[in-house]
């Protein structure tokens, strides 16, 4: 098998993993169904966590049903493509309604059908400092990415939007703005960590669903970081090692808030904060880098 690490390929100015970029043309013909629900995040912002929560909601908290397949098969990854693994579009064709779909795509690359149908979107945003540290470690173990280089160079690339999926700043802002015209529930990773039950109840209300209190408690318990890290149907250990090497870093590494402090130097943190302030000026939402 040829090495998977390839340079990122720009599509409409957005750098993407080569294999994902190659699906973009086909992706534009994707047809959304009215009862589809989209989970959208920038990478390393709680996508897998939200996927597991959503599947447990749809399955009424029944653990046997949630264990029917790995999470990436239960919640198809729209733009995913990789040698030796079924692509997201193929998985979606075999997924019965109502479908839950996940994506990291910015709005400029999203299939128009998803916007035209005005399907419900659950967006999860996470503070940029924890995202960039998690992303750096993910680049190391997920071999579809190019080599991340040094932490210092990766940090600069992240700030400049020269990583897969482009600018974090643009991503979190444009999906926030979409709330004004489309049904978007915008959640924060930090709020989910602080009080998962409260956030799950927000999701249920948004979806127009109800579950008994004990089922909600069960979902909170089984979607905790500890339980998911132990669950092979949720922790991505079933992905081929050639694609994700868990001996370098586990896919589910820490899942904490404020871990950035163990990687950023004081100078890097100050440099990042100044850059962040410029790019996030005028935003009517804020992030917490610790709780």
UniProtKB/Swiss-Prot annotation:
By its UniProt entry, which InterPro entries does this protein fall under? P-loop_NTPase, Sulfotransferase_dom
Return the EC number.
2.8.2.1
Subcellular compartments: Cytoplasm
Can you supply one Gene Ontology CC term for this chain's record? cytosol
Pfam families in UniProt: Sulfotransfer_1
Could you say which tissues express the protein in this record? Answer: Expressed in brain, colon, liver, and small intestine of mice colonized with B.ovatus and L.plantarum.
Q: Which residues carry this modification: Phosphoserine?
A: 134
Q: Which UniProt keywords apply?
A: Cytoplasm, Lipid metabolism, Phosphoprotein, Steroid metabolism, Transferase
One example of the protein's molecular function in GO is:
3'-phosphoadenosine 5'-phosphosulfate binding
* Gene Ontology BP terms: dopamine catabolic process; steroid metabolic process; sulfation; thyroid hormone metabolic process
Cite the binding residues for substrate: 102-104
Uppermost EC category: transferase
- Predominantly, its location class is cytoplasm
What residues make up the catalytic site?
104 (proton acceptor)
Per its UniProt record, what SUPFAM superfamilies does this chain match? P-loop containing nucleoside triphosphate hydrolases
Where 3'-phosphoadenylyl sulfate is bound, by residue? Answer: 44-49, 126, 134, 189, 223-228, 251-255
- Is Lipid metabolism among the key words of this record? yes
From the UniProt record, list the reaction(s) this protein catalyses.
Answer: a phenol + 3'-phosphoadenylyl sulfate = an aryl sulfate + adenosine 3',5'-bisphosphate + H(+); 17beta-estradiol + 3'-phosphoadenylyl sulfate = 17beta-estradiol 3-sulfate + adenosine 3',5'-bisphosphate + H(+); 4-ethylphenol + 3'-phosphoadenylyl sulfate = 4-ethylphenyl sulfate + adenosine 3',5'-bisphosphate + H(+); 4-nitrophenol + 3'-phosphoadenylyl sulfate = 4-nitrophenyl sulfate + adenosine 3',5'-bisphosphate
Described purpose of this protein according to its UniProt entry = Sulfotransferase that utilizes 3'-phospho-5'-adenylyl sulfate (PAPS) as sulfonate donor to catalyze the sulfate conjugation of a wide variety of acceptor molecules bearing a hydroxyl or an amine group. Sulfonation increases the water solubility of most compounds, and therefore their renal excretion, but it can also result in bioactivation to form active metabolites. Displays broad substrate specificity for small phenolic compounds. Plays an important role in the sulfonation of endogenous molecules such as steroid hormones.
Query: Which family is this protein grouped under?
Result: Belongs to the sulfotransferase 1 family.
Q: Summarize subunit and interaction data from the UniProt record for this chain.
A: Homodimer.
Protein name per its UniProtKB record? Sulfotransferase 1A1
Gene name in the database record: Sult1a1
């Amino acid at each position: 098998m040829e090495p998977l690490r390839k340079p990122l390929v720009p599509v409409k100015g957005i750098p993407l993993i080569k294999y994902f970029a190659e699906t973009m043309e086909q992706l534009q013909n994707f047809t959304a169904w009215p009862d589809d629900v989209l989970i959208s995040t920038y990478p390393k912002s709680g996508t897998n966590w939200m996927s597991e929560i959503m599947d447990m909601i749809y399955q009424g908290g029944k653990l046997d049903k949630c264990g029917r397949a790995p999470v990436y098969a239960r919640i198809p990854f729209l733009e995913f493509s990789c040698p030796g693994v079924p692509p997201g579009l193929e998985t979606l064709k075999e997924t019965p309604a109502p479908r839950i779909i996940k994506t990291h795509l910015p709005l400029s690359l999203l299939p128009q059908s998803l916007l035209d149908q005005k399907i419900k979107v659950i967006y999860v945003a996470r503070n940029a400092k924890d995202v960039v540290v998690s992303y750096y470690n993910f680049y190391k173990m997920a071999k579809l990415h190019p080599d991340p280089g040094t932490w210092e160079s990766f940090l600069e690339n992240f700030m400049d939007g020269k990583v897969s999926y482009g600018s974090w700043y643009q991503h979190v802002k444009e999906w926030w703005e979409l709330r004004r015209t489309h049904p978007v529930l915008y959640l924060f990773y930090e709020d989910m960590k602080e009080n998962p039950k409260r956030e799950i109840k927000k999701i249920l209300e948004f979806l127009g669903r109800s579950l008994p209190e004990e089922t909600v408690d069960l979902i909170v318990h089984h979607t905790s970081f500890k339980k998911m890290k132990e669950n092979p149907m949720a922790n991505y250990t079933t992905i081929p090692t050639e694609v994700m090497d868990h001996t370098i870093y586990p896919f589910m590494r820490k899942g904490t808030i404020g871990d950035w402090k163990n990687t950023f130097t004081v100078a890097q943190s100050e440099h990042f904060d100044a850059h962040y302030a410029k790019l996030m000026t005028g935003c009517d939402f804020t992030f917490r880098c610790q709780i």
